[in-house]
Structure formats: structure tokens, C-alpha cells
Amino acid sequence: MIKSILLSVDGSAYTDTVLRYGIHCSKACDALLRVLTVIDVRIFEWAVAAGADGFVPILPSAVFQEESRRMLDERASAVLDKCRNILQTEKCKFELHKISGPPVDVICEQALTVDLVIIGARGEFARWESKMIGATIEAVTRLCNKSMLIVDKEFTTPSKILMAYDGSPNANRALSITGFMAKKLNIPITVLTITDQAEHGRNVLREAERYLGPYEVGIDTAIASGAADEAIVGYAEIHNFDIIAMGAYGHSRIREAILGSNTEQIIRKSKVPVLLAK
């Protein structure tokens, strides 16, 4: 099911973790790693636009633009060189790709040819983003049509998965990749549903158990109540789960615009990787 994995790297503190999770998944699934770094052309476009539209128009010189492009290209090459050394040492199958363009567009386009995307929760400007998820990752999680593993700065060998399940179509799609990953990584799954209605919760959990049965992995179930994002992240933290798996963006866009989405909140608050199923 997972034979190729896209690793989005930018040289930030998250790059090493993206590589480590990629290596772990690649070895478990015998999957090819496609390592991608993007030279962000928006930097040049912003510089020109800001200069032209300013109160006192000042356009950056051609020399400045050329030197900036050269520096970014060299940095991207250095990132890929370091990735190459690590992956060769780990004896993984891999490809390296350096592409210029808007990061969101490039990542989503490259994701069309893989089964899974692994990306850091924040990028090279993380120090200024506080606890908010990066603008690039937020857009990619919405626009990318492939499942994603969103990781933080620390790598932990996965030992158990918390699967958030509510019986919705999006959550149901997450069962497949969660079962597959648990089987390949040889780790158990706990299926968690958030509801104040115990009988409904038990019915939802029975459905998940029945689906996951053929994967022949350890399965446990749990019911919690409260705000979904807080309950899921809190349960994962209290019980020391290493991955949270869930369907992506289950609410209407109108509701998300007003209240925010559970998906975004869980990515922001979680201290462990989040597996988003598409």
C-alpha cells in the first residue's frame, strides 16, 4: 500500500526528524524515499513587489536578485547533500529533488506520485511562528490529496498508535492506512471516540474493531468526552502514544472559518506526529 514516500525538507530543525521518520517507514514498508527541497521563488517576487509599491519605490538590483538566488540554490544543494549522506548510511532507496516554485504548489504536485507525505509541523521560520502551525503545512494539509505524517522536532520510535474515530467517512478512510502502518510497524492501535453518549460510542468502536480485525494487530478501544481536539491530544499525552491517526478536515468550511478545525488544533497542540488520512 505504501511503496513511495515524499519527504519535504527545508534545512530547518524539523528536517532531521522528517528524515528519521521517513527512514523508519521506508524500512518497514520497503518504500522508496523521494526527498524534496523547494527553492521558494516568492522571496524574489515579494522583494520586487514591495519595492515597486512602496512609498518610495526602490527595486532590488539584478545583482542582488541573482546573488540571492545563488545563495538559496547552494543552501538547497547543501540540504540535499546532507540528506544523501544520511540515507546512504541507512541503506535506503531514495531520490533527491530540488525544485523552484511556490512551496505549497510544488509539494502538492510532487505528492501526486507517492503514497505518503512526511513533513515538519513548522518550517525554517518556526522561531517566529510560536505555537501556530506553519502557513505552508496548513495549506498543504488542506490541498494535498495524499495521506500525511506531520512530525515535530523530536524522533521517537513508534510503539503504539492512537486512532481518533467518529464513524464519519473521513475517519473511516483513516482506518485503512492506520491498520496498514500498525501492521508494518508491528505496533498496536487504540481506537478512541469522543462522545457523551456511551451506547453510540460503543457502536462506533465496534465498527472500527470489525474493520481493523483482518490486519491482525493489537486493538484496544476507549471513549472520552469533551472538546474533540483537547480530549484526543490529552489522551495521547496521558497514555504515552507515539502517533495520533485521524481523518483530515471533517467539518464544513463555514464551521472551520468560524471556530477553526479539529485537524488544525490537533496538529498545533500535539506533541507527537499526526497521521492525516486522505
Give the residues covered by each predicted segment.
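A short, acidic, amphipathic alpha-helical segment used as a generic capping/interface helix at domain edges
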Residues: E209, A227-E237
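Generic structural signal for helix capping and beta-alpha/helix-loop junctions
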Residues: I43, V104-V106, W128, P158, ...
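Short glycine/proline- and acidic residue-enriched helix-loop micro-motifs
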Residues: P60-M71
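Small/aliphatic-rich secondary-structure junction motif
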Residues: M1-A62, E90, L143, T156-I223, ...
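Gly/Ser-rich helix-loop-strand patches that form or flank binding pockets
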Residues: T15-K27, L96, P102-E154, Y235-K278
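Short, surface-exposed alpha-helical segments at coil->helix boundaries
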Residues: R69, D73-D81, L175, R202-R206
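A structural motif corresponding to the C-terminal end of an alpha-helix
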Residues: V79-F94, Y215
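Short beta->alpha connector loops
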Residues: S12, S100-P103, S168, G226-A228
